[in-house]
Structures are given as C-alpha cells and as structure tokens.
Amino acid sequence: MPPSISAFQAAYIGIEVLIALVSVPGNVLVIWAVKVNQALRDATFCFIVSLAVADVAVGALVIPLAILINIGPRTYFHTCLKVACPVLILTQSSILALLAIAVDRYLRVKIPLRYKTVVTPRRAVVAITGCWILSFVVGLTPMFGWNNLSAVERDWLANGSVGEPVIECQFEKVISMEYMVYFNFFVWVLPPLLLMVLIYMEVFYLIRKQLNKKVSASSGDPQKYYGKELKIAKSLALILFLFALSWLPLHILNCITLFCPSCHMPRILIYIAIFLSHGNSAMNPIVYAFRIQKFRVTFLKIWNDHFRCQPAPPVDEDAPAERPDD
C-alpha cells in the first residue's frame, strides 16, 4: 500500500512541480534559441547550452526523483542510491559549465586579438565533453563505495534480516555526509566557486583598465568592445551569484549535520534549501531574457513563429555574436 501524503508533503510536491514547469520549458527555449540563431553560436553560448541541458535534467529528472524520495518508498539500498546520484552529477556539471564560462570571458578580455583562434567551437565541445565526464565521475563516486551501506547493513543484520538492506529511501540515508562535505563541497564546489570569483574580479579589473585608457584614432573602437564585455561579464557574474546563493545553503546545512550531529535542524530550513537548489535551474532563462538582447529577440521570434502563429521580424544571423545588453 503506498504511503499516505500529508498536507505538508502535498505543498512540497506542488512547489517542486511548479519549479519543474518553469525550468524545463525555459531551458529548452534557451537551447532552441541557440539552435535557430547563428549569432548565438560562439563558445560562450556553447557552455550556456551545456548549463541549460543540466537545468532541463534537473526539472525533468531530479525533481521527480526528489518527489519520489520525499514520499519515502521502501527500496533496496542500491536502488535508492541510484535515485540519489543524478542530482550530484547535474550539480557538478553546472559548476564546471560556469567555470568554463568564466575562463572563456577571461580569455576574451585578456587576449582579444587571439581569442577566436584559441577558443574555437571544436575546443569548446571538447571542454564541455570533459566537464560532463568529470561530472559523472564525481557524481557517481558514491556508487563505487563511498556511501552509507556499511552502517545500514549493521542495523539490518542486527535486526536479524538477511540479503540486501531494504530502507526508506532518503538522500541522507544512502549518501555519506563525509562524501558530501569533504569531497563534494570542499573539493568540487567551494574551490571552483572561489576560483570563479577571482576570475571575474580579474575580468572586471582588465575591462576597467582598458576603458580608462585613452582611445587612439587607429585603435578602432576598444571602448565599445570592452563596454560590451563589461555588460556580458556582469550578466554572467549574476548567473554565478544566483548559483552560489541557491546551492550554498544546502551545503552549509550538510556541514552542520556532519560537524554538529546533536544540533537540531528545523525541517523547514531543509525544504527551503532544497527549493533554492532546484529553483536555480529555473532562474537562468529569466536572466538571459532580461539581460541578453539577442536571447530576448530570439525568444520572442520563437514564440511568435511557433506559438502565436504570427510572423516576427527575422533575426540577422550574419550579425556578430551578441553580447548582453547590446
């Protein structure tokens, strides 16, 4: 007999479904926009597509699995472990995509004349592939043995049971907090976030330095170029800020759970942290729509062409790759 759902669980499920209904169409629209608009085909937007793919998977896969775990079905230990690992893979993929975007922006302002020969679409695809492979390695590490099976088996055998343990499937019952804090957070989340902060600080410094230089007659229009780069850096730094704001609370709660086992953790705080982490997948398309004109124009074109059946002005695909707010 399936477990009954409380009013609190029903509210949780309703909010998760709402997040998924915003996240999946929004990020599919991002991928669609890059596909139909040639002006959104440079390396930066390749990394943005990778980020959008991870966000689509959060809405289409992770949130349904989170709802399933919240209901608390009884499953075999390794079945529950397989349900818990996708969120680790997708979180890591998002972090590495954001890091790749930060490095890309740094190279664009550090070596503007050589940028297109250094950062080619082919190399961007190789970088994205490497990021996903690394994400699977990090996210599937609990499947290789760093999990709570030993502790669960002790309790299982102490009760006189045999075979693989059957448990109430919950994330913290199968995923080791040592893994989440020491390996996942301290190695694969916090250092990349700090590195990205340093990279964007350097990007802003280089841009300000160039903008403060006097413009010579033979220099083309560096003020315009670096002005655009400043706008895109601000937009992408905002994406990074929202990611950190969304995911750090959950990792901080994990640290409290590990280092202070006796500390009482209000359940509502855990739910808020979960909502923030899942809600991040719905934020990026909104930021793109408001801050990147080429995305905004392409979104409207897709809407008019495919949903309103009204022709929209054509997007100039021969125009140079768009910068936010340009």
From Swiss-Prot:
SMART domains: 7TM_GPCR_Srsx (SM01381)
Membrane topology (Cytoplasmic): 34-46, 103-123, 202-235, 293-326
Disulfide bonds: C80-C169
SUPFAM superfamilies, alphabetized: Family A G protein-coupled receptor-like
PROSITE patterns the UniProt entry points to: G_PROTEIN_RECEP_F1_1 (PS00237), G_PROTEIN_RECEP_F1_2 (PS50262)
Locations listed in the record: Cell membrane
Sugar-bearing residue positions: N148, N159
Origin: domain of life: Eukaryota
InterPro entries from the UniProt entry: Adeno_A1_rcpt, Adenosn_rcpt, GPCR_Rhodpsn, GPCR_Rhodpsn_7TM
UniProt record, GO biological process: excitatory postsynaptic potential; G protein-coupled receptor signaling pathway; leukocyte migration; long-term synaptic depression; mucus secretion; negative regulation of inflammatory response; negative regulation of leukocyte migration; negative regulation of long-term synaptic depression
Extracellular side: 1-10, 70-80, 147-176, 260-267
Assigned GO CC terms: cilium; dendrite; dendritic spine; plasma membrane; synapse
Main location: membrane
Single annotated GO MF: G protein-coupled adenosine receptor activity
Family listed: Belongs to the G-protein coupled receptor 1 family.
Its biological purpose: Receptor for adenosine. The activity of this receptor is mediated by G proteins which inhibit adenylyl cyclase.
Protein name listed in UniProt: Adenosine receptor A1
Underlying gene: ADORA1
